[in-house]
């Protein structure tokens, strides 16, 4: 029981970390796209 609980907590932490890094990458891509649009104008 205790082992499975630790696995669930670990999996949740990994999922949160993956979501955080993914969001940061998406934000950087959006900033690059916005910067590119401003340069074109």
From Swiss-Prot:
Location(s) in or outside the cell: Secreted
Instruction: Please give the superkingdom of this protein's source.
Output: Eukaryota
- Spell out the GO cellular component terms annotated for this protein, sorted alphabetically and separated by semicolons: extracellular region
Where is the signal peptide, in residue numbers?
Answer: 1-23
Gene Ontology terms for molecular function? toxin activity
- What is this protein's function? Probable toxin.
For this entry, the protein name equals U-megalopygitoxin(4)-Mo5
Q: What is the lineage of its organism?
A: Eukaryota, Metazoa, Ecdysozoa, Arthropoda, Hexapoda
């Amino acid at each position: 029981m205790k082992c499975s609980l630790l696995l669930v907590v670990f999996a949740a932490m990994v999922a949160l970390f993956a979501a955080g890094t993914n969001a940061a990458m998406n934000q950087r891509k959006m900033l690059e796209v916005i910067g590119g649009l401003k340069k074109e104008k």
